[in-house]
Regions:
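N-terminal Lys/Arg-rich, disordered targeting/topogenic segments
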Residues: 1-19
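Catalytic cores of phosphodiester-bond hydrolases, prominently lipid phosphodiesterases
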Residues: 21-24, 28, 32, 36-393
Length: 393
């Protein structure tokens, strides 16, 4: 009899476990269906966003050309500087002796509502472990330049279309693809327009970061050396004489290590009104450099890493973490005479401790996700004590 009741209890327990398991499976399936529906909706919205991005960028450029600059007053660079610019120029201050404020993902604007819903749902089901970053939003490139930003970062994704090769400026081509400057050529044209109307501006650097991991559908392609050389051509054709190339910086030196050993970067005066384009370290960096190790034929300066500090072609180095930069920059900047980029924060996180390290490290390009905004409603801003560029010496 006891065995009989034991079997009954065991059967009841098994039935309960089966019901619990089935309930869990049902919940997982429901979550999966919800996420799949949101994912599909995001893809559809992302596809519609592409044309919207292009239309908005074209309209913005037309506005700049035909209305914005008609009665335009150039930006007051001195009001943005933590030092007297003319005195610095007169004393021969060099480009690598000035710190400039930049922005991270300078093209980014609010995502589609569908993508926002997808990311917030993922975050909810993952108990807050997924950082949605859906509130991240930057002003237009022109607005950022007006406010004193002198380093811009542009992510580039290659797309083959019926009309040819295009280079798209966005974060993720199929989902998170909203952008204030979706076409690379038009983005460069916008920057060139601002530069032409501010001929004495502090030197501008543009970081071009090719996205290596791309799902090859809808014409999107993995970045290659051939595509990199096409970007070079677009840069030269669009920026024209405003572009300062590696060859311009190198002059008659044997290589860039020789230039750095001589502590002979171009002066602030010689780089004023100029634009330099920097190729973020990527899969094609080595082959891009190998085309000419003196960089005499390339339009972009390769941005390399700490381990490349003594190479003959190294000029700009990525050292994003302020903690690391504080330790390594004495060698990179004081001894190797390199220009270093460091990130002061990483949206949505920031801290006084990280900002203190960013201020201490001495990097010449400090990028932030919390710059001044055109609408002036931000409760939190990172800058150089109210200024946008400062002397390092």
């Amino acid at each position: 009899m006891l065995q009989y009741f034991g079997v009954i209890n065991m059967t009841k327990t098994k039935n309960k476990l089966v019901k619990i398991l089935l309930s869990i499976i049902a919940v997982i399936l429901c979550i999966g269906i919800i996420l799949l529906s949101l994912f599909v909706a995001s893809l559809v919205a992302g596809n519609k966003t592409i044309q919207n991005n292009i239309d908005l960028q074209n309209q913005h450029l037309e506005y700049l050309k035909n209305e914005y600059y008609k009665n335009y007053t150039p930006c007051d660079e001195q009001a943005l500087a933590k030092f007297n610019i003319e005195e610095a120029i007169a004393s021969g201050v060099k480009f690598n002796e000035v710190a400039f404020l930049g922005t991270h993902n300078s093209y980014q604007i609010y995502p589609s509502k569908q993508y926002e819903a997808l990311m917030k749902t993922l975050d909810f089901f993952a108990f807050g472990l997924v950082e949605t970053k859906t509130e991240f939003n930057m002003d237009t490139l022109t607005q950022q330049l007006e406010l004193g930003i002198r380093n811009l970062e542009i992510d580039v994704i290659t797309q083959e279309t019926e009309s040819g090769t295009s280079f798209r400026v966005c974060h993720t081509p199929l989902l998170d693809n909203t952008s204030s400057c979706y076409d690379l050529k038009n983005a460069l044209e916008e920057i060139k327009l601002w530069s032409d109307n501010n001929p004495n501006h502090m030197p501008i650097t543009i970081i071009v970061e090719p996205k290596g991991k791309v799902v090859e559908i809808n014409g999107f392609k993995k970045f290659s050396l051939d595509y990199c050389n096409q970007v070079d051509t677009i840069i030269r054709d669009t920026l024209g004489e405003t572009l300062l190339t590696p060859a311009d910086m190198l002059r008659d030196y044997k290589n860039f290590k020789a230039m750095r050993d001589a502590d002979d970067w171009l002066t602030l005066q010689e780089t004023r009104g100029k634009i330099m384009v920097l190729l973020h370290d990527c899969d094609v960096t080595d082959s891009y450099i190998a085309q000419n190790e003196r960089l005499k034929t390339q339009a972009m300066f390769p941005m390399l890493r700490y381990d490349d500090r003594n190479e003959t072609y190294t000029t700009f180095v990525l050292n994003n973490n302020p903690d690391t930069a504080v330790v390594q920059n004495k060698e990179l900047i004081d001894e190797c005479k390199l220009v270093v980029r460091t990130r002061a924060d990483d949206y949505p996180t920031f801290s006084d401790e990280r900002y203190s390290k960013a201020n201490e490290c001495g990097s010449q390009i400090i990028t932030t996700d919390y710059p001044r905004r055109a609408n002036k409603t931000e409760s939190h801003i990172y800058d150089f004590d109210g200024y946008m560029f400062e002397l390092l010496k």
